[in-house]
Amino acid sequence: MKDRNTIQVINVTGLGLSGKSAVTDLIGCFDGVWSPDNSFEFDFFRLHDGLFDFMDLLENEVSQGRVDIGFKKILLIAYRMGVDPSIFDLKGNFYSSSQRYNKFFNKNFLNETNNFLLSLVKDSYKAHWPYQRFIQSNFQTFIEKFLLRINLGFLTKKNIYILNRENLNQKFNSYFLTLLKNLDSNSHTFAFNNLSEPYNLNKLFSWVNNVKNITVLRDPRDIYASAKIKNNSKDSFIGFEDVNLFIERYKNNASSVFKGKDERNLIINFEEFINDHENEKKRIINFLNFENLNFIESSKFNLSESSKNVFVWKNYPELKKDILRIEKDLKDYLS
């Protein structure tokens, strides 16, 4: 059995509609492993100006001004992604970006994240700080400019924060561990969809202790066909409507997938995961060191259901022209 005092993190990622959720569901069938519902992706770390970017900024940036603005950005992003407002919470509904992470993390995402970020503050002082206008509302900027015009500029002074840069990795992982315990206090392993993208895993490997990554690749013909199906539903997948745009986007993304030699990284093909399931399952078990964990059959992973997502493109003859284009331009990525 795994040591429940040693937390393992698994990131399962792909190129969009890659079938990664099936792999995450399989991983979640092992004893002591937490995995999310398909509707939950924790983007707070990976998005532009998210926590990974902020931690890199804090570790490497010399300019205190840039660090201060980055700090204020990440506080705002955390609030917007974390708040789970009631219908009567006007401020929360105004700012919310709809991820509602507080709901998923036992109502503690905002508390834990703010406690972590504010614990990094070493000192602060007040000063005129026009650079903050780039991250505040136009209305607030207008009011400040008006106050300056009528010689009330002292009211526009901002808090400028000086941050502590020591032991950042230790502090980050202590915070992350606290977050994980709010998902499930009894699990020893936590699997996420898209904690990091597959293009540059260096930030994931640099900041998260005891982490492994699985990148799931899928035949682009099936991705395109699946996207077209979604485009006819309320879950339209942005950017896949046009075959030319799809080819350009897929080629750019697929060519950028991290394929460096690293024992923390495993690349699997979705079609092989389905058609040669037992062998691929063994690869995953060995990679994650799950040999001694019990596999619990559940409705979470359903091989027969997942198998319906192989050769999807063959069911749509009306896409033949587009499929031929994909076969020509993306021949190196076909399964």
Across the structure, where does each feature detected by a protein language model lie?
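Generic structural "secondary-structure junction" signal
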Residues: 44, 225-226, 275, 313-315
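A polyampholytic, Gly/Pro-enriched intrinsically disordered region
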Residues: 55-66, 234-246, 312-322
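Low-complexity, flexible helical/coil segments
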Residues: 46-51, 69-77, 225-231, 248-259, ...
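Short, solvent-exposed coil/turn elements at secondary-structure transition points
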Residues: 39-41, 219, 271-273, 299-302
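PAPS-dependent sulfotransferases, especially Golgi type II membrane carbohydrate sulfotransferases
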Residues: 1-11, 125-132, 237, 251, ...
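PAPS-dependent sulfotransferase catalytic core
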Residues: 1-166, 302-303
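PAPS-dependent sulfotransferase catalytic domain
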Residues: 111-294
